[in-house]
Structures are given as structure tokens and as C-alpha cells.
């Protein structure tokens, strides 16, 4: 067996409508599938950005993350951009604040962080 690529990343959110608006309307993800699962009383939303898929589970009863951002599990989700200054301006025009742009000492590339509505760290990496 040979692993070919990461197929998707899954994120549990506390407010489905708020997170759907954030990822689709503000960040520009494309909706692939959307389904309410009555037996679980939750929403499942499959999104696409380029070749990457993001799976959103809207679970109002999910426990909160125990510590931030150093809890076990997903630390952050990073997006590659060509021009970080342009990307920061684009996010600002949608009401999304970012941290100060800084240099990644390991890669020598510029990066910054922002957060989704549940506080999940999201990274821009040039």
C-alpha cells in the first residue's frame, strides 16, 4: 500500500451556521455536500479548496477543546498563499483579524495566524 495524499481534514464546530458562513462566505470554500443527520442531531458539511477537502461536523453538544493551542489533536490548519500581504488584506476586508506577519525560522517563509469561529488556529504560509 502507498499513501497518495491527504484526502480531507475533519473539524467539529459548535455553531454550524456560523462556521459554514466563515468557511464558505468569508474564506471561499466550495460546498461539495451538506447533510443533516437526524439520528445524530448534527450537520455534516464537505467543502473543497483547491485539491483539499475540509469536513465540518456541526455538533452543538461537543465538548470544548481542553487547552489552546497545545491540546493533543489538530494544532492548526495552514493555507498556502502566493502573497501574504494581499491575503491579510483580503481577510481584513471580510472582518477577519490576523496576527502580525512573521518569518518562519525553519522554512524562511512568511506566515501569520487567524482563527475560525471556534478558535481553531488557521495559518497563512507564503
Could you describe each region identified by the protein language model?
Residues 1-2, 88-126:
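Vicinal oxygen chelate
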Residues 1-18, 74-79:
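N-terminal beta-strand motif that seeds the catalytic metal site of vicinal oxygen chelate
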Residues 41-43, 73, 108:
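Exposed loop/turn and edge beta-strand positions of beta-sandwich/beta-sheet ligand-binding modules
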Residues 1, 37, 45-46, 66-69, ...:
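Short secondary-structure boundary/capping segments
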Residues 54-56, 124:
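Generic preference for hydrophobic
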Residues 32-34, 40-42, 56, 61-67, ...:
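A short, acidic/glycine-rich surface segment
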Residues 12-54:
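Core segments of cupin and vicinal oxygen chelate
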Amino acid at each position: 500500500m502507498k499513501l497518495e495524499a491527504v484526502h480531507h481534514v475533519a473539524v467539529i464546530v459548535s455553531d454550524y451556521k456560523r462556521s459554514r458562513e466563515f468557511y464558505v462566505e468569508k474564506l471561499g470554500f466550495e460546498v461539495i455536500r451538506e447533510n443533516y443527520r437526524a439520528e445524530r442531531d448534527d450537520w455534516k458539511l464537505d467543502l473543497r479548496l483547491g485539491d483539499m477537502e475540509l469536513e465540518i461536523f456541526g455538533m452543538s453538544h461537543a465538548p470544548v477543546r481542553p487547552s489552546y493551542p497545545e491540546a493533543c489533536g489538530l494544532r492548526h490548519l495552514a493555507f498556502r498563499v502566493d502573497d501574504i500581504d494581499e491575503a491579510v488584506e483580503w481577510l481584513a476586508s471580510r472582518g477577519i483579524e490576523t496576527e502580525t506577519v512573521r518569518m518562519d525560522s525553519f522554512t524562511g517563509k512568511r506566515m501569520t495566524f487567524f482563527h475560525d469561529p471556534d478558535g481553531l488556529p488557521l495559518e497563512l504560509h507564503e
